[in-house]
Amino acid sequence: MKKHVLASALIAATSISGLAAVPSELESSRFSDSDLTPSPACLCAHPNGDVFVGVDMLGSLGKGAGKGKVVRLRDTDHDGKADEHTDFANLDNPRGLIAVDDKLYVLHTVIPASTGVMTGMHLSVLTDSDGDGKADGEPRRLIKNISCLKHNQSRGADHTTNGIRMGIDGWIYIAIGDFGFVDAEGTDGTKLSMLGGGVLRVRPDGTEMEVYTHGMRNIYDVAIDPFMNIFTRGNTNDGGGWNIRFTHQIQSGEYGYPILFKNFTDEIIPALIDLGGGSGTGVMFFQEPGWPEKYNNVPMMGDWGRSHLYIHRVTPDGPSFTQKEEKFIQCSQIADVDVDGSGRLYLAAWNGAGYKGNPKKGYVERVVPKGWTYKAFPDLSKLSGPNLVKGLKSESSTARLHVQQEILKRGDAGLAPAILGVINDKSCHKEGRVAAIFTYGQLLGGKGISALMASSKDAAIQEFCLRAAADRKPIARTLPTAPFVQALKSDDKRVQVAAAVALGRIGKGAAAEALLKASVPPAPGSHDKPNSGVVLPHVAVHSLVDLEAVDACLKALDSSSQDVALWALRKMHTAKVVDGLLAKLDSTTDEELQLKIMTALARLSTKEQPYDGSWWWSTKPDTRGPYYKPVAWEQSEKIEKAYRAAYENSSAEVKNRLADIATRHRMNLKGIGKVEVVDKAAAAKKGEVGRTSIEDVMLSFEKLKGNKKRGKKILSGMACVACHNLKKGDVIKGPDLLNIKLSKEQIAESILKPAATISDSWVTVTMNDGTAHLGTLVTKNDKEVIVHDIAGIPTKVKASDVKSVKTQTSTLMAPGLANDLSLQQFSDLIAYLSKKE
């Protein structure tokens, strides 16, 4: 066996530090401990200060019924610690929460006690009409089957649907993991299926469900700013080229995971940055008065893997942004974040609860500015209509949203003139005007369109008036295209994008020519760096596809809009498109256009197999593209015949280019480019650990029985003696392997992700003179401190000379040290380590 030298601490401590580290301007307090909120997977704050926590004792990989609930917490004396709690509802796998008025929207699974097997994941709403902290009855379904049941049953809820958040447009936005979903059904009968991850949205009553964006990996939540910019912080695919991504989610956008981001980058909206390894979790956009300016008006993004809440400083860049990340609050395996109407920030900490939950791990932290004093959020139900309208001008994004929801609940159209007054009040901050725009549009529906279009003449709010007007498809279908076509000529790129998206929703083919003329794709860029120039052509193409604008696109092949037209055509699998392209291929003498047409035909030669949920691409999927499971369709034979004919009649140089195109699009044409050969032989076992995600390694423990004797031999072959004491009498070097008190999953994680958890004994001793000693703490008393470095060499210092002794926040141990092992060998190793005495 190949020898491995373990460079530092192999085994993690039995617990992770539970103290949140906040900037000096802020202060934190423990709001609840694991006795009330163990394994908190999500939370939300009601504006009145009630905190709802989703307790998920199954974690990402656990199974079984009766291990989830939503707990309501209250801090009645506002001292930073919950002093009242009730079990609001028993629900399996609570993963997303929104509290509005007396309603709690919950994303959860159902696991009957009679079988212990999951039957589905749903978006539901619960009501507490008497305010006793307990749901009045059973959840009412808004969306049924919002994940892929087979994979939730076999794996657990790890790549499933997760966080939910409401925007100022009144939609509920849902973070879809890359399990995707099959036959998700809203209350109006709308059914959708989606292969892969993205963002879904639905009205609060469960109607009008639609895909908002697609092509993400395993996002956990969405952050929504007052202008309906949506941001996500994603999840790494464990070395496959898609790491943590901070992404601006633009309506109708395709982000490319896993089949487009590497080889078809020109067809995606790239991430704003790739941040390396980690696990993005709960996020929000924070805008609350009373907080220090530098921590306000920012996306706050949790990262479970890095145990930090981050801030991303976003700077406008045309229709999108650039960004700069900075650490904000350290929180042990942060799972979620939210704020109440009084400006109290709440963080859910998983805190080492593992992959299957732990009743003794997890907590909720409260963070406020130093000097913060409690100011009660008003009881909105008792406010007059005019005072509610004034609330739309609040400096608090929390207040504006909940004021809006109270107005909509009352449904008083008599408030519309006052709301319109806020829309047209140029002295009001833009956040207030935008809140008024979306409130007005929802309150009046189609009856408010004429006023919104009149207000759209104000350049400062044009983007939002256009968006609000076309936001609901039943209304959008009735709109004229002229104002939106005119908006495509705006000097403001954000207005152009809003208009392009709206024209696709309006659905009138007459707009196709304007969309084609407005869109010029930039040069292809990277999949993980900002490229704001691609946004307008990207959304225009998706609108052209929605419009089924075949004739307009074929006509544009002789114009400056040629590239956008071909981009749209290769996304439309119809006989009319194929025949039109073949006709143009025969009639043109432009060799470059011919090659572009051949590229489009290559793309159209197959299409994606409809997703039925019977399979999943795993945590490390094939990234070749352009389809994951390409299948032939009615026009495939015709395209192959034309492609072969063109190839035979081409020069050697053109043949080479056609062969490359065929290979790139995986046409599998014998004699033209590469033909894929499926290797049916069993995959080699060596190196399985390196090729397998950490979640799948954990799942393998359920199937593979570890052998302690074999594990001992494997450990000795890994030369751990270089850094650890393996038997009694060994010199203490790195953390002790003789007396490990961790679960199999915890030991495995500490090997596969050594930076995730650090042993409490792995410390830095800082002296009064500024010097420091790194190593394993052997002795600490009022007389002396002794540490052993990684070679086992002791350093003894006087306690009076020591300034501090702190647990290390990083490790010398590199990841990948067990990569060459098979899953069986790794299971044997863990069996030995977990049974050591």
Specify the residue positions occupied by each region the protein language model found.
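Electrostatic cytochrome c docking/interface patches
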Residues: 686-716, 731, 744-746, 770-771, ...
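Short inter-helical turns and helix N-cap capping residues of alpha-solenoid HEAT/ARM repeat scaffolds
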Residues: 395-396, 427-429, 457-461, 491-492, ...
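Post-cleavage N-terminal segment of exported redox proteins
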Residues: 14, 369-379, 442, 471, ...
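Beta-propeller domains with acidic blade repeats across secreted/periplasmic ectodomains
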Residues: 19-387, 398-402, 406-409, 480-481, ...
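Amphipathic alpha-helical scaffolding segments comprising HEAT/armadillo-like alpha-solenoid repeats
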Residues: 381-390, 412-424, 443-456, 474-489, ...
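C-terminal capping alpha-helices of c-type cytochrome domains
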Residues: 31, 103-104, 109-110, 172, ...
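Residue-level detector of extended alpha-helical repeat arrays and alpha-solenoid scaffolds
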Residues: 399-400, 430-433, 462, 496, ...
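C-type cytochrome heme c attachment motif
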Residues: 281, 363, 439, 713-726, ...
